[in-house]
Amino acid sequence: MFCHLRPMRRLCLEKIFPHWFPFSRALSGAEAVNALRPFYFAVHPDFFGQHPVEREINENSLKRLSVYLENLQKPGFKSLKPTQLTFYVRETDQSSSDGQEPFSTSGFRAVKFTLHTRDLLSTVLYILNSCSLSVEHIQSLNTNMHTQPLKEAKRMPDRPIKWDKSYYSFTGFKDPDEDLEQVSRVETTLTSWLDNNGKSAVKKLKNSLPLRKELDRLKDELSHQLQLSDIRWQRSWGIAHRCSQLHSLSRLAQQNLETLKKAKGCTIIFTDRSGMSAVGHVMLGTMDVHHHWTKLFERLPSYFDLQRRLMILEDQISYLLGGIQVVYIEELQPVLTLEEYYSLLDVFYNRLLKSRILFHPRSLRGLQMILNSDRYAPSLHELGHFNIPTLCDPANLQWFILTKAQQARENMKRKEELKVIENELIQASTKKFSLEKLYKEPSISSIQMVDCCKRLLEQSLPYLHGMHLCISHFYSVMQDGDLCIPWNWKNGEAIK
């Protein structure tokens, strides 16, 4: 007698997008990706090269979103746990800050939302709406089955229907708000999350072990063959992806061994573009073909010459600024090529020469500074180094450095002390839990890592035995079995 109630279940989602349901249909995976193009364009990590922290957060959130979308398409799935995501959204032509955080001076804003949808269409609409992006283009995806224009659909009365809890109890239907309400009532704790995800992580880690051994073998062979200092990756690609990149480099070495040996003593980094980095690492763009890589290795002697000139330029700037050391901190600065960084230094050096500001020789020895192209006022970082804008006023710069020099020395001393404590706690945590590996994402500070490890050591966590544990900003089981936990994980009372 209640058969007529089943179609009414879908009306619960009208609370979010009531005008779409008269003409909606199930989206395919390809259609969903196409519909999300404006979103991907607004959050793609490649557009955040000048902002490494925001870039990393977007990368991680995109991975979790991808898993969510994949699970939605699996046959027979019942329900998904609410997934909380954070994205930094670039200002685009169709972006609007209505109801959202305002854009920063860098041209992006942080958007946080929780996915608790049950199908691809409502998920796509929810994401676009959360980021204040247009949904007009999605109408074309429904024209094969429905020809009613969007503007007519919008004329329908927007009356959200909220069913009483007794309706779901009586019919046995799933309350779409139940999981979300539960999340708001009960925060995820470390022990509960490990209980729910530990076995899955162990299985993934076990499956990845052969590839991990292959990765280590390839890395050791290439490092020895080319006499490299190290081989690294800019992004957190999976083990299979990394092995594929090393196999590609190995094949190139077989064809052009003498050319590749020009990288002797260097660190090779697989990244988004080919060239030499600001600190002298050889960057191999993963989308480039062997021909581009070969040309890069052939040009290495000229890069080494530019690197020597860059070091001289850094020394000249240091001399003009009382002996302060010019450094480039990879974890905190945008990814720059050697040419880009040299140009930045050259502009700054010429401005200093023209201003003729005076510092007592060697009065600032032991201090450090980094150059930024997207700042307009100097600042002092908590780690003790100065953030100096390339185009800042030299007179203001002189006053700022002199007044903050003592505080900078104190910050640097605390940084060194904190680093020692951090390393000791990492070793202690690794030993106590018999971890195979304990590491952190670049955006996690030493203060956050110390706080995290101190609290971990107070726990009994048998699921961590033999695991790879990454301290991050969120909970996740990576594709190769690495466990990611937020640095401010909670067990009982919230950590503020």
Swiss-Prot record:
Pfam families xrefs: DUF4460, DUF4461
Keyword Mitochondrion set for record: yes
Subcellular location: Mitochondrion
InterPro entries cross-referenced by the UniProt entry: DUF4460, DUF4461, TCAIM
Positions in coiled-coil regions: 404-437
Primary location: mitochondrion
Cellular component per GO, a single term: mitochondrion
Keywords recorded for this protein, A-Z: Coiled coil, Mitochondrion
Function: May regulate T-cell apoptosis.
Protein name: T-cell activation inhibitor, mitochondrial
Organism: Homo sapiens (Human)
Lineage of source species: Eukaryota, Metazoa, Chordata, Craniata, Vertebrata
